[in-house]
């Protein structure tokens, strides 16, 4: 089935009959990706058939997902998506998920009936064949349980053969953007199903970008290790702690341990520690997610960081390490330029004193003067600018500030503040044109705005009479 045709058919299938949500090609791709993580090869292409999808559903249903993070709602969603995909490939036209499940139940019922009839015929002909087959299955299961993750050679001895390339790539892609989050923990639970303790440690240490998350996981694992040692004193029959954490043993010895419970216990410790770290990052703003704002005082940033560290479930050594490094790494650029030369081991009092004046006008001007001195520029700019309005007014006012009145021509004030008002009509000081009482330069009893005759826009009093130079024209 072609991809475009598959997308059209998926958009017609409802997730539930009561809702208007429909399946998309993204749902199918997610289910296939999770199936591939479980070790089952599943490819969605144009040549995929309904029989292949039915085999994949059967293999996924046979997996033991008790200790896997893919269980509950995610497991049901994967199965339902694959069954809808199978029903479309089989030629059915389901309206919703329930209809597709009904088609699948009918198909499996027919398969069981046909298989039962065939097994009945085989038992009647070869009665001892079934018993031999069951014995072989039990023997193979025991061999696989004892040899995983080691490989059994031809002479029957187990041999450790590490192959972490696929797991390392998956883990690197899962932690590339957000580090150890909830999605990465689910991926970690899937890819560490058959790994020994040394391989799990190598997997965690393969992400140097998120070293802080890995250190938190290791600290929580050490807490569980100490708790198990204390518990072992009262329960001497428990497995050895060194066997659980793989201490003092080679990878081959870890792989050939008789007790598979040790590997599984260490794996559960790592998953629980990673889940606690991921939940702490997403539930409340933890110390890893606290950053200093561009204009936030350094003391306020340290107070928020210390409050977050106090609420974190971690040893005091881990909290002290985080406080020393995060107080520098998560500060803003201005504070980092001062704290980097001091180093993370500097006492907190010196850090606070160094960043006390960061962001103020004085510190900015000091940085400016220092930069200008390094460039060899001599400037009369003072090191500290005035901070009060009075001081600012005293420096920016006065005749030497360059301001000149275009009315009287004097410096020290502007035209709107000039006290020597001048009338534009008569040219005399002391009043404005709207209050002028003169008429053509002569005194008038009526105000300027109430005269009967309109006035010109220029001074007529200053104009003289003009005599024409040409002789007059005489008409006969």
Swiss-Prot record:
Q: What does this protein do?
A: Matrix protein p16 forms the outer shell of the core of the virus, lining the inner surface of the viral membrane.
Q: What is the effect of changing residue 17 to L?
A: In strain: Isolate R29-106 and Isolate R29-Nadin
Q: Does the keyword Metal-binding apply?
A: yes
User: Which gene underlies this protein?
Assistant: gag
Q: Where is there biased composition of kind Low complexity? A: 130-147
Subunit (UniProt): Interacts with host light chain cytoplasmic dynein DYNLL1; this interaction is critical for intracellular microtubule-dependent viral genome transport.
Against InterPro entries, the record matches this protein to: Gag_p24_C, Primate_lentivir_Gag_pol-like, Retrov_capsid_C, Retrov_capsid_N, Znf_CCHC, Znf_CCHC_sf
Q: Where is this site: Cleavage?
A: 126-127, 148-149, 367-368, 392-393
Q: Does the keyword Cell inner membrane apply?
A: no
* Residue spans of biased composition, Polar residues class: 450-468
Q: Which UniProt keywords apply?
A: Capsid protein, Cytoplasmic inwards viral transport, Host-virus interaction, Metal-binding, Microtubular inwards viral transport, Repeat, Viral budding, Viral budding via the host ESCRT complexes, Viral matrix protein, Viral nucleoprotein, Viral release from host cell, Virion, Virion maturation, Virus entry into host cell, Zinc, Zinc-finger
- Per the UniProt record, one Pfam family is zf-CCHC
Record's miscellaneous remark: The sequence shown is that of isolate R29-127.
Q: Where are the transmembrane segments?
A: none
A Gene Ontology biological process term: viral budding via host ESCRT complex
Domain text from the record? Late-budding domains (L domains) are short sequence motifs essential for viral particle budding. They recruit proteins of the host ESCRT machinery (Endosomal Sorting Complex Required for Transport) or ESCRT-associated proteins. Gag polyprotein contains one L domain: a PTAP/PSAP motif, which interacts with the UEV domain of TSG101.
What does the record say mutating residue 416 to K does? In strain: Isolate R29-Nadin
* Effect noted on mutating residue 117 to E: In strain: Isolate R29-106
Q: Motif PTAP/PSAP motif located where?
A: 468-471
| MF GO annotations | nucleic acid binding; structural constituent of virion; zinc ion binding
Q: Where are the zinc fingers (CCHC-type)?
A: 403-420, 421-438
Where do the record's region annotations for Disordered lie? 130-159, 437-476
Q: Which family does it belong to?
A: Belongs to the bovine lentivirus group gag polyprotein family.
Q: What is this protein called?
A: Gag polyprotein
What Gene Ontology terms describe where this protein resides (cellular component)?
host cell; viral nucleocapsid
């Amino acid at each position: 089935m072609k991809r475009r045709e598959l997308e059209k058919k998926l958009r017609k299938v409802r997730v539930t009959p009561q809702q208007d949500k429909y399946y998309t090609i993204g749902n199918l791709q997610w289910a296939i990706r999770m199936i591939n993580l479980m070790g089952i090869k599943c490819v969605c292409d144009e040549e995929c058939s309904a029989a292949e999808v039915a085999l994949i559903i059967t293999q996924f249903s046979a997996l033991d997902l008790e200790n896997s993070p893919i269980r509950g709602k995610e497991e049901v969603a994967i199965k339902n998506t694959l069954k809808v995909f199978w029903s479309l490939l089989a030629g059915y036209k389901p309206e919703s998920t329930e209809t597709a499940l009904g088609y699948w139940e009918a198909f499996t019922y027919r398969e069981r009936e046909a298989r039962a009839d065939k097994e009945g015929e085989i038992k009647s002909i070869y009665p001892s064949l079934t018993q031999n087959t069951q014995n072989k299955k039990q023997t193979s299961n025991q061999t696989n349980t004892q040899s995983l993750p080691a490989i059994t050679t031809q002479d029957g001895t187990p041999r450790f053969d590490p192959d972490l390339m696929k797991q390392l790539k998956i883990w690197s892609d899962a932690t590339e953007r957000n580090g150890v989050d909830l999605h990465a923990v689910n991926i970690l639970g899937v890819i560490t199903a058959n790994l020994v303790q040394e391989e799990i440690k190598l997997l965690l240490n393969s992400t140097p970008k998120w070293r802080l998350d890995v250190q938190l996981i290791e600290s929580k694992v050490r807490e569980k290790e100490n708790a198990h040692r204390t518990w072992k004193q009262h329960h001497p029959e428990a497995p050895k702690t060194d066997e659980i954490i793989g201490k003092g043993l080679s990878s081959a010895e870890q792989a050939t341990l008789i007790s598979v419970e040790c590997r599984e216990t260490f794996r559960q410790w790592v998953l629980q520690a990673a889940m606690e770290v991921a939940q702490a990052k997403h539930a409340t703003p933890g110390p890893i997610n606290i950053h200093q704002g561009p204009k936030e005082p350094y003391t306020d940033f340290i107070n928020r960081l210390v409050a977050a560290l106090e609420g974190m479930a971690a040893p005091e050594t881990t909290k002290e390490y985080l406080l020393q490094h995060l107080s520098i790494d998560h500060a803003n650029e201005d504070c980092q330029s001062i704290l980097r030369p001091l180093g993370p081991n500097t006492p907190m009092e010196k850090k606070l004193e160094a960043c006390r004046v960061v962001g103020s006008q004085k510190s900015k001007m000091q940085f400016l003067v220092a930069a200008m001195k390094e460039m060899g520029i001599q400037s009369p700019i003072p090191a500290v600018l005035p901070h009060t309005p009075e001081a600012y007014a005293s420096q920016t006012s006065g005749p030497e500030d360059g301001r000149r009145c275009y009315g009287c021509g004097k410096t020290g004030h502007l035209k709107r503040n000039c006290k020597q008002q001048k009338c534009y009509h008569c040219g005399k000081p002391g009043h404005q044109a709207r209050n002028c009482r003169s008429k053509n330069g002569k005194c008038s009893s009526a105000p300027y705005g109430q005269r009967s005759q309109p006035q010109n826009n220029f001074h007529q009093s200053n104009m003289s009479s003009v005599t024409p130079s040409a002789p007059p024209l005489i008409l006969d």
